[in-house]
Curated annotation (Swiss-Prot):
Protein name (Swiss-Prot/TrEMBL): Glyceraldehyde-3-phosphate dehydrogenase
Record-listed NAD(+) binding positions: 11-12, 109, 167, 300
Paired cysteines (S-S): none
Organism for this UniProt entry: Metallosphaera sedula (strain ATCC 51363 / DSM 5348 / JCM 9185 / NBRC 15509 / TH2)
Chief location category: cytoplasm
Active site: 139
Pathway where it operates: Carbohydrate degradation; glycolysis; pyruvate from D-glyceraldehyde 3-phosphate: step 1/5
Positions that bind D-glyceraldehyde 3-phosphate: 138-140, 193-194
Enzyme type, top EC level: oxidoreductase
Domain of life: Archaea
Length: 340
């Protein structure tokens, strides 16, 4: 069993912790929190071992939250640490993980040089095997890479031009916006997403633009992909529908918005309304010669969760990427084919 610690129990950390609990080959040592908020109370109610920094011990005691120990105790017990701390904090913790001889995963908010390799399970699982430090790319980059590495199986990609409509905040983030504006993110081109894709697909010609929209549900990507040889729409739909972690939303289902996608997730009984899969609007898929056009939605809170699980196996020396993906998908109910 791989013993895993999760440093940070926010949007990503709590989902990764739940995913670890579902794995047949992993055990959750515990999670860490810096403040005794509702997430800490929920972790306690779920029976998850809670670890805190030495500085916050008294605050947790005063809040009546029982802790298992301090952060260093948790790290000491683990084989792998999943760092789910806020952007930039993970790089600071790397020294701690290194000094204690632990392998660690970092999230996409960290700079690429924090790790030995940036990771996307469908693209470069093999590159992460036995590495000490792996960075799981961000939600948007995960969506881009999952799509591009899938399309690349039909015809080698020559170039990509993409527009990303980013959600303004997660549903719980009450202090973020905008609430009545569209904001270029940034106005200069390319956006950072193209550069991040190149940390995995290093030679790909890709340019992205991004805008922040006043919504909390999902991101939406609009891609124009030029491939090296002509393909058909049927070729594209076939590879998309047969690839794990990608779902098609058909026009017949009347699912035509991110709101309806999230509603389907609710109706499916998904924990926290999560959709680990990329959701492609089937009617958007169009082919003109060597160009493939499509639109898809990315659930920013959960798309990276199965990627973290696979990365845990990779750094632990599990060499069979396809098998890892199958194990993760089976344990978490992750599908392929059609959303409805």
């Amino acid at each position: 069993m791989i013993k895993v610690a999760v440093n940070g129990y926010g949007t990503i950390g709590k989902r990764v912790a739940s995913a670890i609990l579902a794995q047949p080959d992993m055990t959750l040592v515990g999670v860490s929190k810096t403040s005794p908020n509702y997430e800490a109370y929920q972790a306690q109610k779920m029976g998850i071992n809670l670890y805190v920094t030495k500085e916050s011990l008294k605050e947790f005691e005063e809040a009546g939250i029982k802790v298992k120990g301090v952060l260093e105790d948790m790290i000491k017990e683990a084989d792998v640490v999943v760092d789910a701390t806020p952007n930039g904090v993970g790089a600071q913790y790397k020294q701690v993980y290194s000094s204690m001889g632990k392998r660690a995963l970092f999230q996409g908010g960290e700079k690429a040089n924090v790790a030995d390799v940036s990771f996307s399970a469908l693209c470069n699982y093999d590159e992460a095997v036995d590495k000490r430090y792996v960075r799981v790319v961000s939600c948007n980059t995960t969506g881009l890479l999952r799509t591009l590495c899938t399309l690349n199986r039909v015809s080698k990609i020559a170039k990509v031009r993409g527009t990303i409509v980013r959600r303004a905040a997660d549903p719980k983030e009450v202090k973020k916006g905008p609430i009545n504006s569209l904001v270029p993110d940034p106005a200069s081109i390319p956006s950072h997403h193209a550069k991040d894709v190149n940390t995995v697909l290093k030679d790909l010609d890709i340019v992205t633009m991004a805008v922040v929209a006043p919504t909390t549900l999902m991101h939406v990507h609009l891609l124009d992909v030029t491939v090296s040889s002509p393909v058909t729409k049927e070729d594209v739909l076939s590879v998309l529908s047969s690839t794990p972690r990608i779902l098609l939303a058909s026009g017949k289902s009347k699912v035509s918005s991110t709101a309806e996608i999230v509603e389907v997730a609710r109706d499916m009984g998904r924990p926290r309304n999560d959709l680990y899969e990329l959701v492609v609007f089937e009617d958007s898929v169009s082919v003109r010669g060597n160009e493939v056009f499509l639109m898809y939605a990315v659930h920013q809170e959960s798309i990276v969760v199965p990627e973290n699980v696979d990365a845990i196996r990779a750094v632990s020396g599990f060499a069979d990427g396809r098998k890892s993906i199958e194990m993760t998908n089976a344990s978490m109910g992750i599908g392929k084919g059609y959303l409805v």
